[in-house]
Regions:
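N-terminal alpha/beta PP-like core and its mobile active-site loop of ThDP/TPP-dependent enzymes
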Residues: 5-333, 361-364
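Active-site diphosphate/adenylate-binding microenvironment
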Residues: 16-29, 34-37, 42-49, 335-405
Length: 408
C-alpha cells in the first residue's frame, strides 16, 4: 500500500492532493487525524503537500476536541480526518461541544468508494445522517473533479457567522481519482449588523429606572469588547453577565469583570430575581441546565422585559461599538479587575485548595480548559484577579473534553 501511494505522486494530481492544496490555500493549515484505510490517499497528501501540519490523535474524540480548542483560540478552522461513519460517531461528543461553542471546524470524513457502498460492507453507514446533528453544512463529494470546489465551500461554511462545523465526506475513489484543479478561497458572507432602531431601543432601556442586565456570550467576551461594555456599565449602572458555559472568555487582572450565571438553579434564580430589563447579546434567555420538579425552566422573572440586541450570528463587536457611540460613553472609564491572588492552602486537598493553587500559580495568558459542571463553579472567585487568561468552558455539557481542548 505504501509503495503504491508513494508511486502515485509520479502521476497527475489526485483528488486528495487537490483537496489538501485547496485547504491550505483557504487558510486551513492544521489537520487533526485518526485515519483508516479509506483515508490513506488523503494521509499521503498531507505528507506531500507543503503548508499542512498533521497531528495524530489515538481516539476520534481527542481529534475533535483538539479541533475545537484550536478553533476557539485561533479564530479560524482546522481540519479533522475521521474514518467513515463509526469514526465520526466516536467524535460526536466533542463535536457537540464545538457546535455549542460556535467553533469553526472542517471535518473530512472518509467513505467507501462510491461504487462499493451498495454492497453494505461492515463499515458502511449513513455518514450524512450522523453528521447533520453537529454540522451546519454537510456534503458528499462524488467526483475528484468537484472535490476542490467542495473543499473551498466547506472552509467558507466553517468561517461563516460566529463559526460553524462543516463536514465534507470524501469517498475513497474521489480521493484517488485524477483531479485537475485547486480551488481559490471563497469570500465569507459578512455578518449582519445591528439596526439603528435596535440601538435606540437598547439605549433607551439602559437609561430607564430599574435594574438592567446585559447578558452575553461569543465574541462579546473578548477583552476589547468587554472594555466597551465596561464603559457602558460605568455610565448607565447596568449589570454585565455571561452564560454559564462560554466558548472563550477573556478574564483576569486588567480586564472588565462580569458575572457568570451559575449552574445551580436556585443560585441562578437568585441572581436574576431583581432584573427588570434583560438585554441579550449573542445569547438566549437564561434557562435551567435540567428540568427539576416544581422549579421553572426559564430563570428570569415573569415581569422581566427582554430586548434582543443581537443574536449569535450577528457582528457582536459592531453592536457594542454602535451602542457605545449612541450612549456617548467613550470618556467614561470601565472598572477593571485588580490583580490579586489567593494564598496557597495547606492540609487536606479540597476543591477550594485546588482553586487557590490555580489562582495563585496561573501564568499570564494561560488557557484554562474547564470541563467541570458542579464543583468547578467554585473556581471563579479564586481566579477572578489572577493573571489575564482565557477560560474555555464545557459548552455542550459533554464531559471528557478537557485535555484534548488545550492539547493544541
Amino acid at each position: 500500500m505504501l509503495s503504491y501511494l508513494l508511486s502515485s505522486w509520479e502521476n497527475p494530481m489526485n483528488g486528495a492532493e487537490s483537496l489538501v492544496k485547496t485547504l491550505v490555500k483557504s487558510g486551513v493549515d492544521v489537520c487533526f487525524t485518526n485515519p483508516g484505510t479509506s483515508e490513506m490517499h488523503f494521509v499521503a497528501a498531507l505528507d506531500h503537500v507543503e503548508g499542512m501540519r498533521c497531528v495524530l490523535g489515538l481516539f476520534e474524540g481527542v481529534v475533535t476536541g483538539m479541533a475545537d480548542g484550536y478553533g476557539r483560540m485561533a479564530d479560524k478552522p482546522s481540519s479533522t480526518l475521521l474514518h467513515l461513519g463509526p469514526g465520526l460517531g466516536n467524535g460526536l461528543a466533542n463535536l457537540h461541544n464545538a457546535k455549542k461553542a460556535h467553533t469553526p471546524i472542517v471535518n473530512i470524513v472518509g467513505d467507501h468508494a462510491t461504487y462499493h457502498v451498495e454492497y453494505d460492507a461492515p463499515l458502511t453507514a449513513d455518514i450524512e445522517g450522523i453528521a447533520k446533528p453537529v454540522s451546519s453544512w454537510v456534503k458528499t463529494s462524488k467526483s475528484s473533479k468537484d472535490i476542490a470546489r467542495d473543499g473551498a465551500e466547506a472552509v467558507m461554511a466553517a468561517r461563516s457567522g460566529p463559526g460553524q462545523i462543516a463536514t465534507l465526506i470524501l469517498p475513497a475513489n474521489t480521493a484517488w481519482d485524477e483531479a485537475n484543479s485547486v480551488a481559490n478561497p471563497l469570500d465569507v458572507p459578512p455578518q449582519s449588523k445591528i439596526s439603528s432602531e435596535t440601538i435606540t431601543a437598547i439605549a433607551k432601556a439602559l437609561c430607564e429606572d430599574g435594574e438592567t442586565l446585559i447578558h452575553m456570550t461569543g465574541r462579546a467576551l473578548r477583552e476589547d469588547t468587554l472594555n466597551l461594555l465596561g464603559k457602558i456599565q460605568s455610565k448607565t449602572g447596568c449589570r454585565l453577565s455571561c452564560m454559564t458555559s462560554n466558548g472563550r472568555w477573556q478574564r483576569g487582572a486588567g480586564r472588565v469583570a462580569i458575572e457568570r450565571i451559575q449552574y445551580p438553579i436556585d443560585i441562578a434564580l437568585k441572581q436574576l430575581e431583581t432584573v427588570k430589563n434583560l438585554i441579550l447579546l449573542g445569547t438566549k434567555v437564561p434557562v435551567a441546565f435540567f428540568a427539576y420538579p416544581n422549579k421553572p425552566s426559564v430563570l428570569i422573572p415573569d415581569s422581566c422585559r427582554v430586548f434582543q440586541m443581537a443574536d449569535i450570528d450577528m457582528d457582536l463587536g459592531y453592536a457594542v461599538e454602535a451602542l457605545a457611540d449612541e450612549l456617548d460613553v467613550h470618556n467614561h472609564q470601565p472598572k477593571k479587575q485588580e490583580y490579586s491572588k489567593p494564598e496557597l492552602m495547606s492540609g487536606k486537598l479540597t476543591s477550594e485548595s485546588i482553586a487557590c493553587a490555580l489562582g495563585n500559580l496561573m501564568p499570564e495568558n494561560a488557557i484554562i480548559a474547564d470541563e467541570s459542571v458542579s464543583s468547578g463553579r467554585g473556581f471563579m472567585p479564586f481566579t477572578q484577579g489572577a493573571n489575564p487568561h482565557d477560560w474555555l468552558a464545557l459548552t455542550g455539557g459533554s464531559i471528557g473534553l478537557g485535555l484534548s481542548l488545550i492539547h493544541i
